A protein has these predicted regions:
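Gram-negative outer-membrane beta-barrel transporters
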Residues: 265-268, 289-378
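Structural signature of Gram-negative outer-membrane beta-barrels, strongest in the C-terminal barrel
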Residues: 117, 144-269, 319, 347, ...
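Surface-exposed extracellular loop regions of Gram-negative outer-membrane beta-barrel proteins
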Residues: 80-82, 128-135, 200-245, 266-290, ...
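C-terminal beta-signal and adjacent terminal beta-strands/loops
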Residues: 359, 368-385, 402-404, 410-469
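Outer membrane beta-barrel strand-and-loop segments of large Gram-negative receptors
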Residues: 100-106, 143-156, 238, 255-319, ...
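Transmembrane beta-barrel strands of outer-membrane/channel proteins
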Residues: 28-34, 72-78, 118-124, 171-177, ...
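Repeated loop/turn-to-beta-strand initiation elements of outer-membrane beta-barrel proteins
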Residues: 23-26, 67-70, 113-116, 166-169, ...
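Flexible loop and strand-edge segments within Gram-negative outer membrane beta-barrel domains
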Residues: 23-100, 226
Length: 469
């Protein structure tokens, strides 16, 4: 069978920095990005389109004096995604979005042996969670034009106290308030970290924190499609809560040439919410979003390691994380634990840069990540013009792992009387790895089957020019 995949993207960045006097700096950052993907599959006799868009703006002002540092930020962001797809003679339009606008102020100051920082934050959110419309021969289905608005306000205060040349404690309290659907939530979140410094190079730490999350990210696709949506806490969807403990070790050599860090953590999670349906369900039943949200508890644990070299001709870092993210939902099973939708068992990153001289340098990076969990359909068939589906264990399957290597050769030069410039030759995906973007259900000889869609760029060389001013 023939499949045509077309992909287009555009990204725009603008950053303006102004030093407004000896004590003030202003920075304006603007970003807009849009991606379009068309998947034409002969089995479907339909063109499936996926669009997603990000827009962000931030205005930052920093004022510093001998007594304090004040930072203020005004932010705006908007995210949208739209999916148009068809199976046989049935078509689906699915769209989601979230808009945020906010203000934050942070103040840092020192008094005696205490280093203080505190601040306030306010955010307004507007949600459009999963608007959909289905039409065709199986079923007509449509959601009302549902909107959500929410307001979040936070205030926090934190102190870094030196108890002894070898001991210090970082403690604070964050008070958050969230209002949506006529319901208000108020949550005090205490946090404390104890540091022990047996020498100037070694640090041991113990951390405990209580955290609340009012926004919930739901994954709609069972095959890795980027069609997640955001929804708000409400009387029926309580704020997520996490009790977090961590033990850490950090080594820093003389003159900060080398750094080594290790952290082991455990998080106990309450009021966890995930989306248990799939895109296929829109075609097979009279659909209500709330009927496909499951609620439960969970835990995360893992180990993070990092080795970093900061100076010398050879510099870079290696980081590795191994972890597990498990959930239990009474709607699925009162006793069985499942992988979280966002579980990532292994995550490895390597970044290396070698500077031959003041003009030439060679850099490279390698990334590896375990595949995303998803719920695989065991069978899908048509009975009396109706689609019928049967699923396996919730998040019981995984997409293949992804890995990739990139390299870049850079030449830096400064013509007499001009600013520093550089030319860059890079190769993306050096060994032409075919990573799986997502999987989808398609017809194969009158039966449904899973098919992988692979990344378009087997290997991508590029040339870049940079002018510093």
């Amino acid at each position: 069978d023939e499949m045509q995949l077309r992909y287009g993207l555009q990204d725009y960045n603008l950053t303006f920095v102004q030093q407004a006097g000896a004590h003030d700096k202003i920075r304006l950052s603007l970003y807009h990005g849009q991606d379009r993907m068309n998947l034409l599959q002969e089995d479907f006799a339909d063109e499936n389109k996926l669009n997603w868009q990000n827009t962000a703006a931030a205005l930052h002002w920093q004022h510093h004096s001998s007594r304090f540092i004040l930072q203020q930020n005004a932010t705006f962001s908007r995210y949208r995604n739209t999916l148009d797809m068809g199976i046989s003679s049935v078509s689906l339009n699915l769209s989601s979005g979230i808009t945020q606008a906010g203000y934050a102020a942070r103040l840092e100051w020192t008094r005696g042996n205490l280093q203080w920082n505190g601040g306030v934050e306010y955010n307004y959110y507007h949600f459009r969670p999963m608007q959909f419309e289905v039409s065709g021969s199986f079923i007509e289905n449509e959601t009302p034009k549902f909107r959500e608005d929410a307001h979040e306000a936070n205030a926090y205060l934190q102190a870094d106290i030196s108890l002894h040349p070898s001991w210090s404690v970082l403690g604070g309290l964050r008070l958050s308030s969230y209002h949506s659907h006529g319901r208000s939530f108020i949550s005090p979140d205490p946090r404390i970290t104890l540091h022990y410094h047996p020498s100037s190079s070694h640090t041991l730490s113990v951390h405990y924190g209580l955290y609340h999350q009012y926004l919930h990210q739901m994954s709609v696709s069972n095959g890795g499609l980027p069609v997640d949506y955001w929804t708000s806490s409400s009387p029926s969807v309580r704020p997520q809560q996490a009790h977090s403990i961590a033990l850490g070790y950090h080594f820093r050599s003389q003159k900060r040439m080398m750094e080594i860090s290790a952290e082991v953590y455990y998080k106990k999670l309450s009021h966890q919410h995930e989306y248990s349906g799939s895109i296929l369900d829109f075609f097979t039943q009279v659909y209500h979003i709330e009927n496909n949200m499951i609620h439960g508890k969970g835990y995360n644990y893992g180990l993070n390691l990092m080795l970093k070299k900061n100076r010398g001709k050879l510099s870079g870092w290696v980081s590795y994380a191994i972890g597990s993210s498990r959930r239990r939902f009474p709607e699925l099973s009162p006793t069985e634990w499942f992988n979280s939708t966002f579980d990532r068992r292994h995550d490895l990153s390597v970044v290396v840069n070698y500077r031959f001289n003041r003009h030439w340098s060679l850099g490279g990076d390698f990334v590896y990540a375990s595949g995303t969990p998803y719920t695989k359909a065991k069978s899908v068939y048509v009975i009396n013009n109706n689609l019928v589906s049967e699923y396996g264990k919730y998040n019981g399957s995984n997409l293949p792992a992804t890995h990739r290597m990139d390299i870049a050769l850079t030449y830096r030069f400064t013509p007499r009387g001009h600013r520093e410039q550089s030319l860059n030759l890079s190769i993306y995906n050096l060994y032409a790895r075919r990573n799986v973007l997502f999987s989808y259900l398609g017809f194969q000889e009158e039966n449904f089957g899973y098919k992988h869609v692979y990344s378009l760029c087997r290997m991508l060389p590029s040339i870049g020019y940079t002018l510093n001013f």
